[in-house]
Amino acid sequence: LGKVDKLSLVFAHIFTLMAFIVVLYSLHVKDDGQHTAAFLYAGGSLGVTFAGDYVTLYIFWELMAFSSVFLVWHRRTKKSINAGFRYLLVHVVGGLFLLGGIITRYGETGSFAFGPISPEGMTLASFLILIGFCLNAAVPPLHAWLSDAYPEATVTGAVFLSAFTTKVAVYVLARAFAGFEILAIIGAIMAVYGVCYATIENDSRRILAYHMVSQLGYMVCGVGIGTEMAVNGAVALAYTNIVYKGLLFMGAGAVLEMTGRSKLSDLGGIYKYMPLTLFFTITGGISISGFPLTAGFISKAMTVTAAAEEHHIFLMFLLMLASIGTFLSVGLKLPYFIWFGRDSGIKPREAPLNMHLAMAITAFMCYFLGIYPKFLYDMLPYPVHWHPYTAFHLSEAMQLLLFTSIGFIIFLKKLTPEPKINIDTDWFYRKGARLFMGFANNIIAKIEYNFIGEIYEFIIRKPILGIAQILKIFDTEVVDGTINGVGNTTLTWGGIMRLIQTGQLQHYAIIMTLGFFVIVTLILF
């Protein structure tokens, strides 16, 4: 079954557009495996978007998980291989939660139909499905796979990853769980959590990955508030975020492609060598920060306004705080330490033409949507009555940007990136996995070998071997003996009868005559 309405169409529109742009961005890549994985991944996202039942959704959901991991593995480094395995493990677990929820829901309702779920009718099945969706939406503490795997993906693979998995999760949450208040609270916390890590991170693509958690927080919060304006805001932000976040990943990827470096502490002073990439990266930075006349301005504030209209003052405060962190980490820190800052001595060439064309199209979309928001608003699931370009919204945005800029200048030395590792929730499952393996090898394995193994040997293995020996004797002596005896008897009599067949007519005549006399004798006497 399929589901085609304004909600699915707006996501399908941006997924298709971004797939085309990233394919253009990756034209220089001579790796058929990577391209195949990317196309399957994009196709899976569209399959989920148009799924009208949970069976179809689950099939394409798993297609996304198993195809996207190859975009990490194809970088072919030890870190990317390990990150890919962790990524796959987490998504397989999430898929099992989703599958369990789907099966349980079918048992409860007798239907696989995919549609809205009422907060009052929350059941075990709904809870399991929600966990599966939230994992793909990178809801803390289930978010570590994103900041772990995305920075280790290939240059072009990271751009694909930034566009699909998490935004598909936003779509299914908006479709099924709009109005769940717990999501509004979780989303606001996500928004702040992500920018905190983005502000202290050193790796450029990991900054963007952490900040993606923050932006997803806005979307999840909008879905949780559940009003028409809030859902419109979540969808609009998902659409624009795919555009400008993709542009930022393209810019950071181009720098990695041309310099071989992604850590801010290893970069700096390259603005004169890659001016076009610099322009495109700054465009993405100001757009994601919500500058007027950019895509971020006409989408992000819609969710904040929706929170204010529903009198969620604390949520609104957290979202505004996250906006400050966004401009600080991605709008200022990221471009400054990549392009300016101290001179790293690197003299890279400009990125290939196809990369520039893809970034140019995406940058154009950032400005086009900001200048002409009606293009996006007409695609949103509900009528839009909110106007971004009011004196209040403009003054609010400019004050936020101005004072954040002043703060960046004041605390510039404190924000200078250092080559260090930041501990996140992935530490627990990394350490937990090691502890589990140690427990399994040192305790469980010994118990299994010394105790369970002996029980298995005495109760199962030896009796089975004894029965097998008896069956073997029966098979060879009785079954095979009977069959072989019949065969041997036939061969013996065949040999005797063969002696009679001499080929001479007089012998046959004598035998026939003797036979005749024997028959007559038997009849008469």
Predicted segments with their positions:
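Hydrophobic alpha-helical transmembrane segments
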Residues: 2-15, 125-133, 316-324, 391-408
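Hydrophobic core of alpha-helical transmembrane segments in multi-pass integral membrane proteins
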Residues: 16-23, 99-102, 192, 362-367, ...
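Alpha-helical transmembrane segments
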Residues: 23, 334, 405-417, 519-523
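Hard-cation-handling environments
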Residues: 351-404
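Aromatic-capped, Gly/Pro-kinked transmembrane alpha-helices
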Residues: 378-393, 415-525
